[in-house]
Amino acid sequence: GSDGWTHSLRAKGRKVGAPFADWKVWPNTLRAHQLLRFAPREKEAQLKKACFEAIYELGENVSDPETICRIASENGVDVEGFRKVLDTPAAQQDVRRACAQASQRGVRGVPYFVVSGREDARPVGFSGAVDAPQLVEIFGEVL
């Protein structure tokens, strides 16, 4: 977690005071996505924030069943119901299908943003940590 592509992420984070953890593992997020698909829609933003904090700021392994169930519980999700569907073929296939659809739309990472504006300008999609000058450039292209 502290080398490769995370190096630029950490560098950008330091500039804006992002408290990135000293990552020991880089978790597979399949179970986190299962949680997001299971939970009520009104919990989605709260759960995304909790998962991002767990991964990036606390260095937790959200691929661990107990960790993702704890996050569910702390955020008011029916943990017993979630445990019943966690890792079922149907739940895994649902996430894989959603990921395939996102990939077809050009999503390559999270978070992912789409900025649109003028009718004559094509929407611009981008993912990950983007600094202010890059955002200004993107907005200039579409607004």
Q: How would you label these PLM feature ranges?
A:
Residues G1-L58:
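Structural alpha/beta surface segment adjacent to cysteine/selenocysteine redox centers
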Residues R37, R41-L143:
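C-terminal cap of thioredoxin/glutaredoxin-like
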